[in-house]
Structure formats: structure tokens, C-alpha cells
Amino acid sequence: MFENILTKIFGSKNERDLKRLQPLVAHIGSLESELETLSEEQLAGKTVEFRQRLAEGASLDSLLPEAFAVVREAGKRVLGMRHFDVQLIGGMVLHKGKIAEMKTGEGKTLVATLAAYLNALPAKGVHVITVNDYLASRDAEWMGRIHRYLGLTVGCIVHGLDDRQRKEAYACDITYGTNNEFGFDYLRDNMKFSLDDYVQRPLSYAIVDEVDSILIDEARTPLIISGPSESSSELYYSVNRIIPMLEKGETIESRDGRVGQTVREYTGDFTIDEKAKTASLTEDGVAKVERLLGVENLYDPGNIELLHHVNQALKAHALFKRDVDYVVKDGEVMIVDEFTGRLMPGRRWSDGLHQAVEAKEGVKIESENQTLATITFQNYFRMYDKLAGMTGTADTEATEFNQIYSLDVMVIPTNRPLARKDEGDVIYKTNREKFLAVVEDIIERHAGGQPILVGTISIENSEVLSSMLRKRGVPHNVLNAKHHEREAEIVAQAGRKGAVTIATNMAGRGTDIILGGNPDLLAQRESAGAENPEAALAQALVKYQEVCAQEKQDVLAAGGLYILGTERHESRRIDNQLRGRAGRQGDPGASRFYLSLEDDLLRIFGSHRVAYIMDRLKIPEGEPIEHRFISKAIANAQKKVEAHNFDIRKHLIEYDDVMNTQRNVIYAQRREVLGGEQLPETFAAIIDEMVEDIVATFCPEKSAPEDWGWASLNEDFFSQFNMPPAPLEVPASDLTPTVMLEHLKQQVDARLQEREAEFTPPVMLHLMKVLLLQTIDAQWKDHLLSIDHLKEGIGLRGYAQRNPKEEYKREAYELFLQMMGRIRQEVVQKLFRIQLAKEQDVERMEQRQRRHRISLNRAGGEAEAAKPVVRDEKKVGRNDPCPCGSGLKYKKCCGQ
């Protein structure tokens, strides 16, 4: 209450922050008339002037008013678009490294040009990050015209570019692209064999469009680069055949009065926990699986892989639904993005889940992949020196943005007052009643000429509704993952008179719905294929400008765009995004959600008391329910899910921070090796450490030389350095561990100098680099697999009254130290065994690594497996001597 009184007197923090920016807005406005008089060359020359002033010590903050005024003037000249005052405020918020919450239709894309231009002046590179390739290409071309007009270079990173094109795009002042491409390029760079092959520059400043989608919705999905593993696909088919024979059971909870605790009993062969999204075998189920597969004990350590396959197959059948979680298209299982409803070609679920779904659907099973490099978006974006973002809905997640990314959210006022009317939820008892009511509402509003955007949460629901409308003769468009090709066109025309558009989730984000329709797109569609396209386009444009202007008046009279949600999402933010499609730039509009007690949100997270009250109210079929208690139950259910998902994301980053530290160490070492300047010193230090370890192990400080482990010392020394220890001409009384250490070091140093003389210093340096990189990469790959196994079982430590997170940190650190030890051991063994070879043999070793193409993957999804490398030279067998001349088998050397 006290806080409310203070807010009324002094205004909220957001209002006070906005007030502080008003003088800057006025300053920018005062420069407008002066800049209007400048010629094209003079305006573009301002960029050179600003860069000169920066070089002389000026700060970006001091240049902000002039830079923003220059961008505003360029926008007027190039695009015919003038930045509103609220857009200038949005640009300032982005420059300060904060999140600007701006409602749909307020021109977020144009806002980004202000902060991007200002922060591009130091020439360190600005990344503008969007959610898909279409928006990245569109914005790079559309908004890039402003930047190019002012003398800046603009690049665009989309799927399918080669390394040369990517490097050119990253070298530009401003680079547009998707979050996936930026993240994968970072991982790929850290697998390169030359610094010249790196495509990215150091990460300086990023503006993330739809920041909530990328930093929150996608945060639980790590980026993964993977290569093929050696697992067989046959086991997936074998296990898949038995899953349909299992019967789904229930969890029955009862109260044990003697101990005062809840007791759970399980029926059937497996049970499903929809809240946790897990499926588990019951005791009867385990016995049945053992009988069907012909194994004695499914939980025997020897059957651990089989158990994993059974669990994944059970999950594929019980939890993953066709046309909801995935679609089958052209003989492939394609994931559907749960937040946008878009298909995600190339992405695959990890841990064999994707293969289990492929077996379930009877399509070809792609080989399972092994992780070679991975990072979460959370840790990737935290590497930027400065990070900012834009979205229409961030305030509900302000705490998470602050805690995880240290980003504050500022709500930017709309240019015109919001005129949308958000009506109360209408709740029905069953899905059937709900959809019948939805159809009646659509028919009534369609007859009145009001455009309607219907939001569904799955492809299945959108097609059910489409079928019902077709039967009633209502013309409509369906926009879901199956019909995504026409997305921009369908969304752009969703504001036409009487238009009915059914869209899964937030498909179409980034394209404004213009009341009356978009004359440009209509004209382009009509003139396509004409004999004289330019003349046809001009003629069609005049026609459709008149048509759309008239339709806009009719639509405004009918009440503007009507948003009809058919189910609440787990997150209030996603619901707000759907509502936000109506009421852009002060236009009228309305929104309403139709719900049923069979909706997943209420069924899984809603209180059982809701259904009880429904029965007591005796509501007749087809009648909606409006009850304060039920509305409150919906709000509570959403808050529960949001809190649950926040905990998962927080939990994920705490675990990933451990890997992040290790990843930074490995990637920093790779960069040092690629620099190559300190390589001889690095190898000398590694060799000294190894000799010290041997002496410390077999020549204890307080024991007599005759008690030393001479046989083991000789064996270990030979294993490492490919030579026996030289005889030591020293009386036994003078022999100490220190004397032994110096003797062995001198012997190894002498042999190393001989090797360098054999190879010549340049070849030796090159060889050291290749050996180190090759060994680091192979060991890091194995380490990632070990960490995956550690993660899988770490939760069980809780049963031993141990903190799983602390145990994970400790064991991950031990695994890391073991990996570093193996790297040292392997590179030294190879260096002392490698035979004198021609310089081109060493080059060939490096070329073989370069040619090894790795498939890109995303867990949440992994992409398809890497194709075999096409070799120019004769293929080497795994057990043949390695052609590099090390003396080792190929599989133990370059074939790792």
C-alpha cells in the first residue's frame, strides 16, 4: 500500500526514467530543420565527422542527439518514414543496453536503426538479431537502405552462406541475422584450424528483436554441433514394435492414516505425468518389457543402452503427438516450434528421441549424433560487451531478464492511445461446446465485415476449426507449419474486410496486419507474370490503393481487427502477443479468449475444484460460464507454469555455467594455439610437467633409490617419449629425485632438439599446432559425452542426501582435469613418435581436418548426420598405419 502511495506521488520508476529522456528528445527535434537543408553528400558526410570526433575522444553518449537526428532525416529521405518521438526514446533505451517494450505496430524495426547506427560508429560491428531468415533478409534490405545512405556497410547472415560470404557479412558495420546463425558461427569458429578462417569478430553490441522469444522461449534449447556416432538404428525398430503392446495406467493417490503420508499406487504398464512431461514404466510394465524383449533384468548395467531406448520410445509414443509436436513431411519428421507454430527443418531432438519418433512413424531413421560443440543462448548472448532488445511483451518477464542477463526493461508509451478492447474470457465445459461457440462468433462478425484473426495452439486444432468453417461455408485462410510458405502474404491481408485467418500461435510475428489490406502486396500478386510487369504493377497499385482505402473505412466502422484466442497459452506473455496484433497505431480492435475445462492448461495445472464447481453449478450444455473463481484459477495456473519454467531455465543456466567456464578455457587455448607464437614454450612446459609427474610417482622423496619403481619408471618413460631412460653415471649415495629429474629433462630436451633439426623449425611448429588442435578437439568431444552421462544420473545423488548441483560441479571439474591430462599425454606421445615426413604430409593432415564437414544440430534439435568426407587420396583403413607417419594406427591418430 505504501508503495502505491509513493507511486501516485512520484510516478513509477518507468515514468521517471522516461521523463529523464525528454530533454534529449527535444534536443534531437531542434536539429531537424538544420539537417533538412543539407545535401545528400553533406548528410552522408556526418558519419565520417562522427567517427573523427570519436577518434578525438568524444563519447557515443555525446554524439547521440546529432546521430539520432541524422538517422531520422535519412529515414525521411530514403524510406519516407520519420521516427516518432517515442521511437527516439526506444532508440535511447537500446543504446543504454536495456530492453524496450513497444507494442505491436509501433515500429520496432525502425527503432533499431537509431541504436545500430550510433553503435556502428566505433567500427566494432553491430549485430541485429531476428527470429527467422525472412525477417533478417527483409530488414537488412529495407532498413539497410538508411545505413547505406549514410555510408555504413550492411551484411546479412542467413542459412546456406559459405564461410567467405559469412566473413564479408561480419566485417560490415551492421550485420542482420538469426540467433541460430550467430550462435552456430561462434561454435564453428572454435573448431577451425586457422585464425584466418574465423568468420566472426569479437562480440561487441547486439540488438535482439523479439527478445522474449529468443532469450526466454528458446533459452532451454542449447545449440549443438554434432557428428555421426556409431550407434545402430536397428534397436529403435525392435523397441518400437513392443511399445504399442503396453497399456497406459493411472497414478492413484491415497492417504495412509498410520504414517500420515500420501501413498501412490500405479496401474497399467506405464503412467504419464503431464506437468513434468514424463512417461514412466510401472513394475508390471518393466516385467512385460523384459518378457517381450527376452532380457532377464532391464536395469542390469549391461542393458543400460536398451533401457535408454525403451524410455525414449515410450516418450515418443505417449507424449509426442503428430501435427502438434511434429509433422511428417516428405518422409521426414519435422519439429514444430511450440512458441511460433513454425516448422524447424534441420533441427532434431537429442538423446535418440528423434530416432524414436522416426521409428514410431515408420520413416527412415537417421543416424544418431554425438555432440562436438554446444552452447546455450543464455551463455552466447552474455558474451556481448553490450546487449539490448525489443519486444511487444517483456514486462511480465522483467525479473528473469534482470536476474539472468542483467537487462532492465523499459516500457515505451504508444505513439497514439491504445483503443483495443480486451473482453473477458468465455469458458465452456467441453472442447466441442467451445469450438461450436467460436464458429458462431466468427460467422456473426464475418457477416458484419469485421476481419478476424483466430489463434490456436496446435496444427491439429487449426485444422479442426478450418473443417468446421468450411462446412458452414465461411471463406478463410489457415496459417500453420503446413502452410508456412504464404505466411507474409496471408498475415498482410488478414486485415481486409471480413477476412478470417486461422493462425497457430504467433506465426507471422514481424509482419503488421494493416486494416483494409496491404495494397503493395496485392498489386505485386496481380502483376506477377504480366508481359510488362512494371506497367502492370503501377496500374494494379492505383486500383488496390483505392480498394484498400475503402475497405479500411468499412473495417473501422465494423470495430477493427478482432482477435479470437481458442486456448490460453502456458505463458501470459504469449497471450498478450496474440492480443497485440490488434489495435496498432491507435486503431480500434477487440480481443477475447474462448476456453474449455478440457484445455491442457486447466486440465493439467488447474485445480480439481474447478471441475467440482462446474458440476455443482449445473450449467446446461452450450452455455458459457463466467465465474470469478474460474478466471482466478486460469491466472493462477499460468503463474504456476511461468514460475515452473523460470525455475527450469535458472536451473539450466546454473548447470551450463560449469560447462561455460570449461568451454571458455578450451576455446581460449585453441586461439592461443592458432596464434602459434608460444607453441614451443607450451610444449616445453607440458613435457617438463610430464617428466616431473613420472619422477614424483616412481622416485618418492623419502625413499632410497633401490626402493624406487625402476621397472615402472622405464616403462612409463618409454611410453611417453618413445625412448628408454639413459643410464645415469652417478654414485647411489648422490642419487636423489632432483638429480633424476634434471637427468631425464636433459635427455628429453636433447631428443626434442634432434626432432626439430630433423623436421626444420617451421615444419615442427606447424606439426605442433596440428597435433594440439587435433587432440584438443577429440578429447573435448569425448568430454562432452562424459558430461552428458554425468548430467543424466546426477539427480539420483539427492537420494543420498547430497546436493546434485554441488556434486555436478565437483565431478565435472574432475572430468575436466582428467581430460587436460589426456591432452598432454597424447600430444607428447604423438610428437615423439611421428616419423620424418615431407612437409606436404603435415599439410595433408591439416587438410584432412579442414575437409571434415560437420552437420549442424540443435538439441531441442540436432540436424542431419554429417555425410562421409570425399577424399582425394586413397582411403585409409582404421587399422592401417597412419599416413602422417606417427607409427600409430590411423584410428588412434588422425582418424579419431
Swiss-Prot record:
Cofactor(s) annotated in UniProt: Zn(2+)
GO molecular function, one term: ATP binding
Pfam families reported for this sequence: P-loop_SecA, SEC-C, SecA_DEAD, SecA_PP_bind, SecA_SW
Binding-site list for ATP: Q87, G105, E106, G107, K108, T109, D512
EC main group: translocase
Co-factor: note: May bind 1 zinc ion per subunit.
Amino acids binding Zn(2+): C882, C884, C893, C894
Enzyme Commission identifier(s): 7.4.2.8
Keyword Transport recorded: yes
Swiss-Prot/TrEMBL catalytic activity: ATP + H2O + cellular proteinSide 1 = ADP + phosphate + cellular proteinSide 2
Membrane topology label: Peripheral membrane protein
Region of interest (Disordered), ranges: 858-886
Localization per record: Cell inner membrane; Cytoplasm
Record-level GO cellular component terms: cell envelope Sec protein transport complex; cytosol; plasma membrane
GO biological process: intracellular protein transmembrane transport; protein import; protein targeting; protein transport by the Sec complex
Biased composition (Basic and acidic residues): 869-878
Described function: Part of the Sec protein translocase complex. Interacts with the SecYEG preprotein conducting channel. Has a central role in coupling the hydrolysis of ATP to the transfer of proteins into and across the cell membrane, serving as an ATP-driven molecular motor driving the stepwise translocation of polypeptide chains across the membrane.
Cross-referenced HAMAP family: SecA
PANTHER family documented for this protein: CHLOROPLAST PROTEIN-TRANSPORTING ATPASE, SECA INNER MEMBRANE COMPONENT OF SEC PROTEIN SECRETION SYSTEM
Protein name listed in UniProt: Protein translocase subunit SecA
